[in-house]
Amino acid sequence: TSYPDPYYYDWKNESGSKVGIISYKSLFLANESDFSDHLNKSLRKIGLSPKTALISTLKNANIQRNLVEKFKKEKIEILITTTSFDSSLKKTSKDEINKFNLFEELNLPVLQILTSNRNKKEWNKSSIGMNSLDLLMQIIIPEFDGRIITIPCAFKETVSINENICCEISNYKFDQKGINWLVQLVSNYIKLKKLKNKDKKITIVISNYPVKNSRIGNGVGLNTPKSIINILNWFKDEGYLISDEDLPKSSRELMSMLIKTRTNDPLSMNNQPLDYLSLNDYELYWNKI
């Protein structure tokens, strides 16, 4: 059977906020649709309407334009993708780069689903998380698109062994715990979208490596303090509640605000702590993230 590219899979006429999903058609052709089916089922269970598109690649301008046209027509509110690498298109000529990008055209949050090339048992026994190949293909490169990295929702499990060719036959098996977490995140983003900016709360987290305050926000070749100030000013312009008194005027003023209390610098231990939380309260807040 021949299928179009993109192939719009398991679409239904149903109510609820619409969630775009992009996944590889090769998995469907290999009879590995369990993951997509369970993701769609879990989204529908909480009243959302999944719109799954199965593709061969994102490196094709016609495929990207088709996706944008279809998703805009459906008025999706968030996008989920399992595709690896980034979405930048190939050069259309020796001198020109095709600047069309479906994520920029859609202008929506894009959640990157992770699928581990290890089985669940190996994953649970390991302390390193994603292996180097998964890290490169599903986290490092996709982040150039501005995708929001999530957690593993499927693991590669051995389903049979072909003794004739001495080879294991593996399929991606969905992880219901991961899918439940992802579905709740999708729901939260959709709810957040409906709030006015003045009612939203945002945390900016920067690194605070031990030993020296000079390592706060450290990024080689990056001006982290200035970037934070630019972000805060953008938030203020977009209607987030930031008063002029709370807005640092310079990088120096921002860093002074950050180091006036305790940090990971041992010399700051005599400074006044910003606040205290009991372990129970901390775990309560952490589990709500």
Spans of model-derived segments:
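An N-terminal assembly and electron-transfer interface module characteristic of large anaerobic redox
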Residues: 1-289
